[in-house]
């Protein structure tokens, strides 16, 4: 049984103003109750975690994270339910009907409605994730680990990389590519130890000034690569030099095996050696 959206009035409170009430019909809430349960479980398992969701349910109705979570559940529930609903376009928006004498809305309109709800859902996801990072319980969850596994824990990356489709679907498609790129940069330039540390700090919003600079520059290289550009070796070298010049801010790198790639052993000839040149 759903815990955050429990009746028709609450459901409509969190939906875009497109569904009109049709007199004599079963309430929209009753029609999509199963989808609300499914959407709530999806939000918990994908984004929020059970512990954090229970905390959110205890917040007051005007709490920002509670409002965004409810909007996300409502939009996803309706997006799932629409294919099984009978819809009619009324002067006040779409209505849910079962009267066979009423002509349903066209497939094109319904498809556009589903797309609009997906966009609305994705906007909710984009707004929710930064709020979740302020919840201490959430930071220790499996869900936080998923989003914190790259330098791009939020959906903003989808606005920086070319592509089509919903933001959430594109984020999921980009994620494995980002993981591969970051792994390559870690091994060859930045060290796995440093990236592991700054990813968590980036998620928590606790980066120091110099580490913010590093993350900004590293992300710029990753975004460029995702858009089909080759890595800028000169720029990567500049980033490494920045790390080398600020050892107190990047101890993970200085203690790593990767750092040794940029500090080759110095060979000195003795005066007895042939070819002595100094």
Residue ranges of each PLM-predicted region?
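Conserved short "hinge" loops at termini or chain/domain junctions
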Residues: 1-67, 84-278
